């Protein structure tokens, strides 16, 4: 069964209005000139092409974004829920972590309280936690670029930002690797990622077990006025296990971004 997209927007319905007598009047020469002018503008816009090294520029900007994010602490709140056939949650996994980077840029995570686990059919695996850490807030840095094939898919406005749309797929997946397969919406002005939508891969199948992963969407926003950091991840997908379909929903909120220096002491509010 195909996976559902994290966000589904119904197509707008076109409405055909009856033509009035005035509407049937032949256009004036001024109208024709305006139509021609707008046609030329539209043709110019359609002819706009991305730079041939778009992926490299994105990776360069992503490296700068990663370096900037390494100067911030933040809070990461995860909710992963099993849903029944009516969309009601039957079990959940909840956790809150404070994410801290040392002056050597080593990542440290501190659980805030104990995780809440009421899942009945699913369990959280090492791959799930690895994806929460590295794939859902995906950063395609220059040292990651070689892992991916990329293809330009057009342009689109998202979150009021004019974007190039870039598809990325793993060239190959080595044993134990977790990679991203999906679409990136890239700001045309600075090549920063505004939005990403896809899936952590590979899906894991064995004779005795299956480890399947939902499609997700991650939204970024400007945090420091210069770099876009992840602020929200959302997934609502149906996983096709051999013993039956299981709908899941996941949210990850990245909040409380605070820039720190070596001598800084960061204090977080209680959740």
Write out the residue ranges for each language-model feature.
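Mature extracytoplasmic/luminal segments of secretory-pathway proteins
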Residues: 2-4, 37, 160
């Amino acid at each position: 069964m195909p996976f559902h997209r994290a966000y589904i927007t119904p197509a707008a319905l076109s409405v055909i209005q009856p033509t009035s007598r005035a509407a049937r009047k032949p256009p004036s020469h001024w109208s024709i000139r305006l139509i021609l002018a707008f046609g030329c503008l539209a043709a110019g816009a359609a002819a706009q092409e991305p730079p041939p090294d778009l992926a490299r520029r994105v990776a360069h900007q992503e490296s700068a974004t990663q370096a900037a994010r390494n100067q911030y602490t933040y809070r990461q709140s995860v909710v992963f829920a099993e849903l029944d056939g009516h969309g009601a949650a039957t079990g959940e996994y909840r956790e809150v972590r404070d994410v801290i980077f040392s002056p050597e840029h080593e990542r440290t995570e501190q659980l805030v309280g104990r995780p809440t686990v009421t899942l009945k059919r699913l369990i959280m695996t090492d791959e799930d936690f690895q994806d929460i850490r590295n794939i859902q807030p995906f950063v395609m840095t220059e040292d990651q670029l070689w892992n991916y094939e990329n293809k330009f898919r057009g342009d689109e406005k998202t979150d009021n930002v004019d974007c190039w749309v870039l598809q990325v797929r793993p060239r190959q997946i080595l044993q134990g690797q977790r990679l991203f397969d999906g679409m990136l919406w890239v700001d045309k002005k600075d090549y920063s990622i505004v939005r990403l939508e896809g899936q952590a891969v590979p899906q894991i199948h064995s004779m005795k077990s299956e480890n399947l992963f939902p499609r997700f969407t991650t939204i970024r926003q400007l945090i420091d006025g210069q770099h876009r950091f992840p602020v929200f991840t959302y997934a609502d997908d149906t996983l096709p296990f051999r013993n039956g379909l299981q709908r899941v929903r996941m949210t990850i909120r990245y909040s409380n971004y605070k820039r720190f220096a070596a001598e800084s002491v960061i204090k977080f509010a209680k959740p």
